[in-house]
From Swiss-Prot:
Subunit details: Interacts with MinD and FtsZ.
Record InterPro entries: CAP/MinC_C, MinC, MinC_C_sf, MinC_N_1, Septum_form_inhib_MinC_C
Protein origin, superkingdom: Bacteria
Role: Cell division inhibitor that blocks the formation of polar Z ring septums. Rapidly oscillates between the poles of the cell to destabilize FtsZ filaments that have formed before they mature into polar Z rings. Prevents FtsZ polymerization.
Similarity annotation: Belongs to the MinC family.
Record-linked Pfam families: MinC_C, MinC_N_1
GO biological process: cell morphogenesis; division septum assembly; regulation of cell septum assembly
Keywords in alphabetical order: Cell cycle, Cell division, Septation
Source organism per UniProt: Bacillus pumilus (strain SAFR-032)
Protein name per the record: Probable septum site-determining protein MinC
Amino acid sequence: MKTQKQQYVTIKGTKNGLTLQLNDDCSFDDLLSGLRELLLLEQYTDGREGHKVNVHIKLGFRYLTEDQEMRLTEAVSENEHLVIHSIESDVMSTEEAKRLKAEAEITSVAKIVRSGQVLYVEGDLLLIGDVNPGGTIRAGGNIFVLGALKGVAHAGCNGNKQAVIAASRMIPTQLRIAQVFNRAPDQKEDGNEMECAYLDIDGNMIIERLQQLAHIRPNLTRLEGGM
């Protein structure tokens, strides 16, 4: 019976270059050998002299060490017409898993953030206390202040546009969500109504009564039972 040769690499041409889908079941050495063999069969040029074709590599559920990634890059670079544009894996590294776990956690802090001080947490911040003018609080997730927010608050500082800022007294010098910022108005009534800030679908920062938060972010329930 004739044995069917295992396919180590599937190549697909796109308008952005070549996509290489790598087999994630075989050994790395077999994969590398199969890749080299396949790339030798064709020149894979776009017809323009001196122009290189972008290669997007999809690893599937395979994790590469730094050495393996370097060897893979060298194998593709042996074809002078190809250049690696991206390498994607469905496997999460330990460092990335730790980062995502930290961003999903709520950190509770009881203190006053005074002028010149910066308080940063990777996930959600629950601050029990005030933020004085000149003080700054930053969080990778949401910010909840049980007190007066009179300084700077930056939620979603790693780019999370779904983050919100809420405070018992919202009289900040500046609010930031992801890369969007909103300076405080020249005059603001010092009321006692709790408020929240969020980005709407157009990326504009909106400040509403805190009661609207349940409608704006209905999935925001991580604080339930945590206070």
